Amino acid sequence: DVLGSRGLGDVYKRQALGAINKDFKALQYFSSPNQLLATEKSSMAPYGEEGLSRQAYRPGFDVECCSGNVHRMFPNYISRMWMNGDEHEIVAALYGPSEYRTEINGTKVCITEDTSYPFSGKITFRFALDGAPVRIPFTMRIPSWVENAKLTVNAEQPKEYHAGGFSTIERRFKDGDVVELDIDMKPRAEKRTDAGINVYMGPLLYSVDIDENVEIIKDQFKTSVAFPAYNVTPASKWNFGLPENPEITVVNTGKKLSLIHISEPTRP
């Protein structure tokens, strides 16, 4: 947020949407693409015997920095979804269902963001003002992977956008105005180190769903019944490969998404 770097938004989004334990009670110190094992002895960067478990999901490691900070992840993410610029500029930097409130020249402004992003590329911003129209530079971050998108105000003529940058609509916004950003999220394959290929859909990184053996550990150092560690090994074939330029087909199951509230006993 200090740098205002457009590229950092893509990195931040990818990290936030990566693999985490849903109750935040276990984490990896190190993670790597195509990791075959996640056990107490699987780390390839051991840092001595105590560091061998750093690629496993555990509540704690030989150092405390990650365990003490992992719970900050989504509060930090949410606090940076909306940012401010100069001259009353409002910036939608990271997308997700949310609401932003401010006051400009005595007029209270509320912007409601409706979206299923990152599972849908349709993002709708609804403006509610309790007074006269006010001039607002309204800026949206357009991810670098975007090839096609449509940006409109009140369903009128599409506006220009800048992929991999920031697009600003500056106008006198009034109560009831609607800004829509519709991103065409296509699957794409990106080459990685050592002839690897990553498959993405928008900001989401896909992985093959393989069967797994899970050993729950409750009696080791820094583990308990409430905060166990896990040894995870594959229980089905994992050694799949992709051609250099794969053809990818998307199948929409029609499943509707809903917010999931973590119950009080397991809330981190």
Describe every region a protein language model picked out.
Residues 146-171, 189-194:
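Solvent-exposed beta-strand/loop surfaces of large extracellular or lumenal domains
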Residues 5, 10-142:
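Aromatic (Trp/Tyr) and acidic
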Residues 1-12, 260-268:
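Single conserved hydrophobic/aromatic residue that forms the stacking wall/gate
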Residues 65, 74, 247-259, 263, ...:
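Accessory carbohydrate-recognition regions in carbohydrate-active enzymes
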Residues 136-139, 169-184, 188-190:
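C-terminal beta-strand-rich structural cap/linker in extracellular carbohydrate-active enzymes
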Residues 28-30, 92, 183-253:
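Glycine/proline-rich low-complexity spacer/linker segments in large multi-domain proteins
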